[in-house]
Amino acid sequence: MSRSLNLAVIPGDGIGQEVVAEGLKVLSAVLPQDVKLETKEFDFGARRYHATGETLTDADLDALKAHDAILLGAIGDPSVPSGVLERGFLLKLRFAFDHHVNLRPSKLLPGVATPLAGQPEIDFVVVREGTEGPYTGNGGTIRKGTEHEVATEVSVNTAYGVERVVRDAFARAQARPRKKLTLVHKNNVLTFAGHLWTNIFNKVAAEYPEVTTDYLHVDAATIFLVTDPARFDVIVTDNLFGDIITDLAAAVSGGIGVAASGNINPSGDFPSMFEPVHGSAPDIAGQGKADPTATVLSVALLLRHLGYEDEAARIEDAVSADLGERGDLPARSTSEIGDTLAARVAG
């Protein structure tokens, strides 16, 4: 019996167009013959904003909702005021589709340089809460523009929101060989939110006796990410701290050029979205210089989320092999890297 994979594709801005094309190339090559790939491209980002003033409408959300998953290239352009696309598209989509798990694997792959001394063992996953914290837009200003201006940005943390992301993190830790989960917060200063996170973490931990747990203040976690990244297996943290430490994690494991991410709706009520961590890089857009590796690894995350474990592993193996050989190869274009990876996964 044939199957189908119905994918919404959002190339977005800058190099997003180029890297998404290579991600789709690899996806088409790796899928079993009985799986029909159906894609629909959506024009979101700076071009549409300038043409229509729109970022993401309710009709757009309805159209996206019909798909199994979403593949995003990059959103952002210097011609658009800061915050317009970030809040009007990225955050709006995240909240509308309840992407409350932001998944960021960090693994130092063969042939990839790290700024850390030696070649440390780096293989961990950050599970970042995606729909609460200070990103909810709960805040404001008074006396704006005066020397007495006051600005607030409220961090919203609910027991429901915290528990569901903590449970997701425990399940992921349980499925990994090391079975270790670290909670990162700042509960000695942010006592209200911090204690909510800590209490729920400890409550859920009792249901996972095989998972080793520990706690780190976020400032201590940043130190250990640099001095001893091997101590981490799975990290769970809130939206703001997760936003910060995931980029540090990417930096120590080779940079954002190889960093993939998933914005996950674990229940499957809405399609999850997968994207490279890097930005739109308008300075090199259209020149064939962008490395599509992070997008290809995001495709692997997408496939694993949808249950295509073998295909995801083949992509990851192909990327590892390709990265390990790059030192002996001349520079390649975006499409040449995609061609190589597609050929590897096709066998």
From Swiss-Prot:
Give the protein family: Belongs to the isocitrate and isopropylmalate dehydrogenases family. LeuB type 2 subfamily.
InterPro entries xref list: ICDH/IPMDH, IsoCit/isopropylmalate_DH_CS, IsoPropMal-DH-like_dom, LeuB_actb
Q: This protein is called what?
A: 3-isopropylmalate dehydrogenase
- Cofactor(s) this protein requires: Mg(2+); Mn(2+)
* Assembly and binders: Homodimer.
Designated gene of the protein: leuB
Where does the record say this protein resides? Cytoplasm
Per UniProt, where does Mg(2+) bind? 219, 243, 247
The positions annotated for binding NAD(+) are 279-291
> Cofactor binding mode, per the note?
Binds 1 Mg(2+) or Mn(2+) ion per subunit.
Q: In which pathway does it act?
A: Amino-acid biosynthesis; L-leucine biosynthesis; L-leucine from 3-methyl-2-oxobutanoate: step 3/4
- EC number(s) on record? 1.1.1.85
